[in-house]
């Protein structure tokens, strides 16, 4: 992802290099008033860069909220949110997977007795047939055996038809994979877009720190975050409609940013 050119940073660095040489020259020549003026210009240039980067970061954050259609003041915020939509889609995948798994297990449970019966009847008939081959049964026994064989063949045909139908149903129960696969791909795409936007915001926040001259102690920050993990936030503004320093919606944020040139 291309984060965009750092035109503001290049401009500030160019100004810094130019004024640094002039500042050294003024100090060497004893032109202290001019040197102070150059220092003030550098400070103003840094403040302008900081202001622009903070404005761009604020605009990007605001656009990210708008893009995902998350308005905490909207009564339909949950339905409008793409994140909520992704959650619903994943819930749909879970529901479809569970439904297919239950359907498959039910069909297997229905098929198991048919297979077991087929195996038991085959073993019994095989034993009787071995007795017949050893001439251990008489004519009446053979007629009874022939009748059992006929019944077995009829029952086997019926069971085979049921098994074939149930196997087809098991196969059809797996068609959820096509639908859920498409859903998962869409959610994955959304997660990738969110990650890309977050990386961009982190990069822009780094630019703000750069202009402000802020250096973070990451070890201390992680330790502090661990200590405050269970802390609660400030929560919503009380009587925000009566306060002039609190914006009340997305339109107010847009107007504010536009008035500042962002």
From Swiss-Prot:
Q: Where in the cell is it found?
A: Cytoplasm
Q: Which Gene3D superfamilies does the entry mention?
A: Helix hairpin bin
The broad enzyme category this protein falls into is hydrolase
Region entry Disordered, spans: 229-252
MF terms in GO: phosphoprotein phosphatase activity
Superkingdom to which the source organism belongs: Bacteria
What keywords are assigned to this protein? Chemotaxis, Cytoplasm, Flagellar rotation, Hydrolase, Protein phosphatase
Keyword Cytoplasm included in the entry's annotation: yes
Annotated disulfide bonds: none
Question: Pfam families annotated for this entry?
Answer: CheZ (PF04344)
Has UniProt tagged this entry with the keyword Hydrolase?
yes
Name a single GO biological process.
Answer: chemotaxis
**For the site Enhances dephosphorylation of CheY-P, which positions are given?**
182
- Entry GO terms, CC: bacterial-type flagellum; cytoplasm
EC numbers listed for it are 3.1.3.-
- What is the similarity comment for this entry? Belongs to the CheZ family.
Please give the function described in this protein's UniProt entry. Answer: Plays an important role in bacterial chemotaxis signal transduction pathway by accelerating the dephosphorylation of phosphorylated CheY (CheY-P).
Q: How does it assemble?
A: Homodimer.
**What is the protein name for this chain?**
Protein phosphatase CheZ
UniProt lists the gene as: cheZ
